[in-house]
Amino acid sequence: EEKIAHALYSKGIFPEAVEYFDKTLAHLGRKQPSNNITVMIRTVFGFLALIKLLYFPATRKFQIPNKLDVRVSNIMHPKANALAMIDPRKFFFESIGVIKDIYRFNFTLYQDLFDFISGCSVLFSYTGISFKLSKRILDYTKDRSTSGEKLVSLAYHKVIEKSHNLLSGSRDSGLEESVVDELLSIGDSFSASTYLWCNFIQFNQEGSFTYAKKCLGHLKSISDKFHDDFSTMIHFIM
């Protein structure tokens, strides 16, 4: 079921992917709560854990995640991306709730943990709750990206940063094709397409139509190569 979930996700078939991700998590003993009261309690504790992580990092020692924790993070990251597209409300509450479970780990040691924490920035920029908190998450994770035993990639981090800048009205350096290339090299067409989408919108707003057209060309190439519904949909919309 886990392989099916990842296959569906890579093809942009998000509703079915989430269904199989949930089944896998249930088999691993990490079933997400459905009771509204439990969800709200997890949300509150998850938010408090995030604040503690961002503003009081010196008061705690990180733990090393075990194999199950790493496997769960490998599931939660793509699941969160899929939920953001099909159910923003569930995406917000589930992602905040999961922070409580993973904030105690040294997220700089594992790419998926690092990407998940970085991606939490979207919870506050996408919803418009707090661009300040969204930026704080980006700065915090970037500052610690070289503090682990091995370097983590900032490619996905730059996708989230691009989204934050677009939503907050901040200017940035524009399209970095190396980000697209790196994401595609690991088969992450979702993040590559999202990055190009945000750049396309920015270039259109600035009147830089030549660069906007370049983004379209990249998206067409991704759609033709990966045949996933998400990049095809984004290309069609643009």
Residue spans for each PLM region:
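Amphipathic helix-loop-helix modules that constitute alpha-helical solenoid scaffolds
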Residues: 7-93, 126, 207, 217, ...
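Extended non-membrane alpha-helical scaffolds
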Residues: 78-238
